[in-house]
Amino acid sequence: MDRYLPLVVFLAFVLWRCDSSKENKTTYHPHKLDTVPYSESVQVGDMLYISGQIANVDDDYNKIVEGGIRPQVNQTMINIQNILKKHNATMDDIVKCTCILANGDHWGPMSEEYVKYFKSHKPARTTFGGAELGDGILV
């Protein structure tokens, strides 16, 4: 019996950790626009998932920052920071990003602006281009 004690203790620990009824509570944070079919963000336990953001100005989703990819990346990152702030988080808390570009040729300039927002670490990232994002939306 003594030789199985470590296994029993390990299994008990694993099963205890799997009881996530309180730890992984899911909270859906509604989007500012009640016409969209998704949440602005969803929190599961301590993890916050943010829906895709664009370079809209002043909560007006019909007004996209002008001037090309760099200003759009910066406005998009500001919009992300604003959502994080509402949930007592910062860019330092981000662990994964997905960047979608209208034009793959914007990868370089987008990356140059993107890294300015991550001073303490580099989150995992997936980036792809050639997507139809909408009128005037580059990222």
Residue ranges and their predicted role:
Residues Y4-V95, L101-V139:
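N-terminal presequence-like segments and the immediate start of the first folded domain
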